[in-house]
């Protein structure tokens, strides 16, 4: 356990940030999974789910959870999947 005041605060802020980051990553993965399931099941709301997944990817990239290049690469893959179905 840290003894220095600033180190104690960093432990608290790191724990808070960890919870926030885990929640955002979970939202991202859920959005992408729902899109993939809709594509596999030929659902009608594929385009709406694609937009939601792309938005989640952009949000994660802006918060530093994933890199900007990964977000763009994943969005490209989403749009290819949506176009092929």
Curated annotation (Swiss-Prot):
One BP term from GO: translation
Segments crossing the lipid bilayer: none
Keyword Transmembrane included in the entry's annotation: no
Molecular functions (GO terms): small ribosomal subunit rRNA binding; structural constituent of ribosome
One cellular component term from this protein's GO annotations in UniProt: small ribosomal subunit
Keyword list, A-Z: Ribonucleoprotein, Ribosomal protein, RNA-binding, rRNA-binding
Pfam family, one: Ribosomal_S20p
InterPro entries per UniProt: Ribosomal_bS20, Ribosomal_bS20_sf
HAMAP family cross-referenced by the UniProt entry: Ribosomal_bS20
Family of this protein: Belongs to the bacterial ribosomal protein bS20 family.
Function: Binds directly to 16S ribosomal RNA.
Protein name, as recorded: Small ribosomal subunit protein bS20
